[in-house]
């Protein structure tokens, strides 16, 4: 389990929220609401993983896998109480995402019970998107059918690769042939399907990656996520690289593999809607969009993060400490921060530029520290100090020229590979 914990002020008392948690969106509208549920358990911890997970499923009363639903109920009910206390309106969850860890380590009945808790505490929209993550070898046909019957609409499988030696390096436990089987089971149950891929694993050739892409397009899921491998300090893979047992991924190799993914998925009918995500039209992950579009969400479970109004919160990471706080009636929040206007605008630009819709050029002058913030046409035209910057980004092939003429900053394929560079240029 990763020991790192964000630094921030704890909440006062038993977990009272600051008044800024009830802040409306910058345009004055009420934010939609989502729920994230973090299940921290895994049968095996992958060598590259730095998520808040544990292979110990029996950590004591309240923190063990068999007690998880009961402890989660305590957090969700406390969350509803503190949200009421600052005047946050009751809003039915538009999306629910169960992540981990490996949520499907728990029985399907437990996951359905968790969804019922969300319905009890917040309500659930009639057309809510309800997703669980799953490993291909952690589900069976009956379990997927039970999830669909219990209200889940979507399952995201951690495929990562279709090549055995790559899966071995990543320390994944499933066989490649398992993936099309579980996708077929999910479809029969009426669930929408997503496959997660990782590219850039040590020893993965371009031919290996193409083989994985060919298998994905053959299976034909509704949604695909593809992420470059990041070797985080402190992980087992980081130690292997440091000792020279595995090579460090190369940036040029990862860029080529991203371009290969975009070409293969586009040819198969999947459209990119965020740098790392492609989907059939209408199958975009709405829960992901909640993060990118500044919705409110409550994150429950060890180490989960929440966002309410102008406040970010994060839970205690260790399941034993998390469960102990809930048992004593405390909201298990380890820290929080209040987001100021400048930080919110920077985040809006940073996240928005990653989307297919990009960001409105005129809105780039809305930051309080913008050099031309006091100009008369603020909000209606590209800030004057950014006009040459935008022209330069178009000239470098990073922004779409046609989109700029329509008043929007939208990344080209090359720009997607250099999104951080574009963001820095637009926020200087």
Task: Write out the residue ranges for each language-model feature.
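Short, amphipathic alpha-helical interaction segments positioned at domain boundaries
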Residues: 413-428
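Minor-groove-contacting beta-hairpin "wing" of winged helix-turn-helix DNA-binding domains
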Residues: 406-412
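Local cysteine-cluster metal-coordination motifs and their immediate loop/turn environment
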Residues: 38-53
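Short amphipathic alpha-helical interaction segments
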Residues: 374-395
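A short, conserved structural fragment
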Residues: 394-406
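Flexible, acidic/Gly-rich N-terminal and inter-domain linker regions that tether
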Residues: 1-36, 43, 90, 401
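C-terminal scaffold of the Radical SAM
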Residues: 17-25, 29-34, 52-85, 91-380
